[in-house]
UniProtKB/Swiss-Prot annotation:
Belongs to the UPF0302 family. InterPro entries: IDEAL_dom, UPF0302, UPF0302_N, UPF0302_N_sf, Virus_scaffolding_prot_C. Coiled coil: none annotated. This is UPF0302 protein lmo1921.
Amino acid sequence: MKASISIDEKKDFIRWFLNKHQMKTREAMWVLNYIAGHDQIVKYVHFVDNLEGCARGLSLSAHGVESEPFLFFKGNIMTTDPEKAFHDIRLNWDEELYVELHFEEAMSSPEYALVREDNPFAAVKLADEEKEMADALIYQSVHQFSREKVLQQIDEALDTRDEAAFHKLVRILQQMDTEKE
């Protein structure tokens, strides 16, 4: 996660974006201009790659990409009506608003990279190889801990001269070692 992005950086980005890209709907441009004109709203705006898990989001598209032109959602309610979105943004200016922008070369844009944040609600997706490595590490750690615990119990059995416990624990240790192989 990067350091906090300033209000001025976000406003500069919105102005750059609107000058560089033609929105699919003029209302999308109006909403972005409205946001950029109000520092108290910009403070709560976060530009993200996806809106997964966000409580309140706005998805806007420029010409040249295959995405819905305008989507606004809050909780389980989704709308393509810019007036409803504008009304909610205006009235609930102090609520976090996550904005997803779709435009050509978005992922290679240095201007967008400057203001883009990680979505704190998105599920972390691990590759299968990473999952296998994590599982192996967990298994190895648990096995090592269990083995050390049994060795400690063997030492205690020797200290107390408990031959039955000693033989039982040695068998457990041998079984653990053969299972690991």
